[in-house]
């Protein structure tokens, strides 16, 4: 649940920033491109956070999430950055486009062999550097309070 809430902070911010920041290449049918789409992306990204937890359980010894661990955070960070790059590779320029703006510059140019000429911008990448840290700190606080 907390992953969905963390994610909704940027999904709905992106929505409020409008087409100047990002726009859909493909519109959802039946007028579902606004809030419903952002809500579904928030739920999906909550699942991505949970997959990061699963990776920790798969590759690290127990006990987990009882105190700060660079290995736990490292796995969550690596997963967050990897999946963001993969999602951008698959969908950026095909489903959505983030505009190159002074405060959201292109930091990775279009990849050779890619089906799109759109580069990767700063804000979506930065989100997935910061968000796993917030999620991880929440997990530690949750474990401490139980």
Q: Model-found features: residue ranges?
A:
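Aromatic-rich, lipid-facing transmembrane alpha helices and their immediate juxtamembrane interface loops
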Residues: 1-146
């Amino acid at each position: 649940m907390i992953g969905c809430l963390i994610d909704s902070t940027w999904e709905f911010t992106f929505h409020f920033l409008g087409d100047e920041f990002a726009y859909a290449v493909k519109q959802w049918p039946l007028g579902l491109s606004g809030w419903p789409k952002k809500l579904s992306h928030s739920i999906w990204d909550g699942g991505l956070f949970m997959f990061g937890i699963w990776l920790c359980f798969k590759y690290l010894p127990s006990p987990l999430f009882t105190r700060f661990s660079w290995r736990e955070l490292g796995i969550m960070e690596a997963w967050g950055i990897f999946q963001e790059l993969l999602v951008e590779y698959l969908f950026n320029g095909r489903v959505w486009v983030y505009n190159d703006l002074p405060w959201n510059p292109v930091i990775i140019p279009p990849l050779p062999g890619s089906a799109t000429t759109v580069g990767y911008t700063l804000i979506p990448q930065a989100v997935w550097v910061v968000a796993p840290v917030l999620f991880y700190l929440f997990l530690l606080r949750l474990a401490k309070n139980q």
